[in-house]
C-alpha cells in the first residue's frame, strides 16, 4: 500500500540520516556551519569563500534564534524548525524590539533566508529529514526600502568641514565612497597599488562579488588622497563610522526633513527624520550612483564602476 511504501522510505531515509553527524541543538549546528564557512568547506555560489559580512549575518541570525528560544522557553533543533516554527518566529519578531527599535521586514527576511540556507545544507547532507523550508509558505520577506542620497551640494558641505584628524578620516573615507561607488568593505581594503594616478583610475577586485572594477579618479578624490600622501584614508569599523557620519552631517547642516513610509512590527507608518540621522556608509554608494545618473552618465558606464550586473538592481540605487 501507499502507507507501507512511505513508511519503508522513511525508515531507509532515517537509517541514512542516522549515519550522519547529529547536533545537540540548532546553535551547535549553526556553529558547525559557520566554522565550515570560515574554513572554506562551504563556499558561495561563485565558488569563493563567504565574506565577513555574510558570517556576521549568520551570527546575527543565531542571536535572534537564541532570543526567540529563550522568550518561548523552548529547545530548537534542526527537526523543530518547521512551518509552525516559522510562523511563530515571524510573529515573535514582529512583536519584539531590539536595541534600535522594531524589526523591519528586510531584517526578518534576512533571518529567514539564512535559516533556509542552514536547513538546506543540513537536508542535503543528511543531518535532518526536515524539509519544511522548501514549502512556499516558508517565505522570505522583502520590502522596497525608501533611502536617501546626498546631492553634490551636500557633499560639498561635508567636504568643506574643518575637522580634527580622527573625524576627518571618517569624513574622507565616506567621501571616497561617494566619489567611487565602492562598498565600505572595499574602501577599507584599498591599498596604494590600487590607485593608478598615471592612468586616472582605481582598479580593485571587490570583496562581495569577486569582480574586478575600474573607477575614474575625479579631482575631489585626488585631493582627498593627497591629504594622506596619495594613499587611501584609514577606516574605522562600520558601526563607529555610521555613528560619526550622523554627527558630521549634522555639523555640515545636512538637516532637511525627510518623510519615510516604513513597516515596523508589521505596521505601516510615516515617520519624519532629519536627513543627517539617515546617513550611513551605504549612503555613499547610492550618492555616487544617483549623482552620476542625474549628470546624464549612461547607466552602463555607472554599472561598470559599481559592479552591478543587471540594470534592475542598479536602478534600485537611484533616488
Name what the model sees in each region.
Residues 1-54:
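N-terminal helical hairpins
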Residues 34-53, 62-146, 160-161:
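N-terminal core-binding DNA-recognition domain of tyrosine recombinases/integrases
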Residues 105, 109-111, 128-184, 188, ...:
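Basic, Lys/Arg- and aromatic-enriched nucleic-acid-binding interface segment
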Residues 149, 206-210, 306-319:
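Catalytic-site neighborhood detector that most strongly recognizes the C-terminal catalytic loop/helix
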Residues 180, 189-224:
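Conserved tyrosine-mediated DNA breakage-rejoining catalytic core shared by Y-recombinases
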Residues 189-195, 293-295, 303-309, 318-319:
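A short, basic/aromatic helix-end/turn motif that makes direct DNA contacts
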Residues 214-227, 304, 316-319:
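DNA/chromatin major-groove-contacting recognition/catalytic segments
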Residues 230-235, 246-304:
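Short, basic (Lys/Arg/His-rich) helix/loop patches that form interaction surfaces
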